[in-house]
């Protein structure tokens, strides 16, 4: 490994932002881009009708609703680091896409609403992070509004997310009484200054806990601050980088993203603490980012990022080696050598051609239907990276076409949208139905809107008698033949040709499990 390679890997930080809906994640994403110099002025998700929409919410449906539906990938620089930021869907109906994004990052930033504490979606996402021991930094947001006491929020995080908190900044007051944050490491008070028209404002800084200026600025709140800091010093968790990197302890920052407050301190610390690109497990071995041969894995496919070009982009995480424009690599699933000629990097929907990229970088490659989620590309060695699954959907709909003459467009649209992984497509063994399965019901609405907008297909849904899906596996051909014969009307193939049992109710599933003990009923399926 040469020095350039090591230097490029070591300065990269690839992370995802996760939160419950409305905790302020997309706003914080904007502010990270603002402080990183990638944008000059932040738009706010709140004023959706204004000309400036949040940079990362670029799809029309996201701008209409003010929620993040797809995953945006953005690159910027800060303090000598190359940062790859993945803004994940915050809405509970998009957790499967969020999960796959978390397989492409080395760390995560968790955003918590100070008024609400830990919420349901946060629990699900933290389960995913725990599975991979992902290091987490926490930003407790909306201190400019009344909320829970910071000790209460941290206790909620520790008890419900099973991770210890180590505050690195500490808030003084909240809501109308919010005065700023104390930086525990530097011994400085950062006075709160509301943002001015989305631009960065620099507030007053007071040095030292015993500085008379502190009492002058805070009044009685200075006494409370000293008491709380003494309590933290005695009973709090000291920061331990090793425990952070193991996913056991989270450094905590407080602020107000909409006011650009507390963001710079968090970002400065984050890039110093967060891990550089990590080794990636493959079926045959673990691949180090410092290896010289190129390898990468596709974790997401987005159709029609530019409606004018009818394009699909495959998002690839580089795992090892160096990418150079036009390089020839092996696409292992189809066994072909391909040239990566037109790779791009992203700033939401803005794309820039990329001449070179390194481990940890996310590049987009044009996909004309040959690339799928989970595909591995490498220079020589046949590799298959693991850990990118499908989850069994919980909601199902039958797709009905209003205009029978558009059957081909419907099929093409459903297949392409299913390739993105946001919805799963099933074709029953009996009949010609299209059954869609999703983790959350809002995804069905998204699919119908995108079919109309991007494929000019008017479709609607009918309910169907399906409550759950399980992928089937057995090493006993006789068991499989018997099962297929007995449950034929309840079986379907998914988009990748894997057999699934679509159970009409939980009791029917229980009965099938009891009747066929040699059959595995799987709730996840590794993307092949």
From Swiss-Prot:
| Keyword Cytoplasm in record | yes
Q: Which residues bind GTP?
A: 19-26, 87-91, 141-144
The protein's name: Peptide chain release factor 3
Checking SUPFAM superfamilies in the record gives: EF-G C-terminal domain-like, P-loop containing nucleoside triphosphate hydrolases, Translation proteins
**tr-type G domain spans which residues?**
10-278
Q: Which InterPro entries match?
A: EF-G-like_DII, EFG_III/V, G_TR_CS, P-loop_NTPase, PrfC, RF3_C, RF3_dom_3_sf, RF3_GTP-bd
Molecular-function GO terms, alphabetical: GTP binding; GTPase activity; translation release factor activity, codon nonspecific; translation release factor activity, codon specific
Arranged from A to Z, the UniProt key words for this protein are: Cytoplasm, GTP-binding, Nucleotide-binding, Protein biosynthesis
Cell compartments where the protein resides: Cytoplasm
Output a single Gene Ontology CC term carried by this record.
cytosol
Q: What does this protein do?
A: Increases the formation of ribosomal termination complexes and stimulates activities of RF-1 and RF-2. It binds guanine nucleotides and has strong preference for UGA stop codons. It may interact directly with the ribosome. The stimulation of RF-1 and RF-2 is significantly reduced by GTP and GDP, but not by GMP.
Sorted alphabetically, the Gene Ontology BP terms of this entry are: regulation of translational termination
Q: Which family does it belong to?
A: Belongs to the TRAFAC class translation factor GTPase superfamily. Classic translation factor GTPase family. PrfC subfamily.
- Is GTP-binding given among the entry's keywords? yes
Query: PROSITE patterns of this UniProt entry?
Result: G_TR_1, G_TR_2
The organism is: Oleidesulfovibrio alaskensis (strain ATCC BAA-1058 / DSM 17464 / G20) (Desulfovibrio alaskensis)
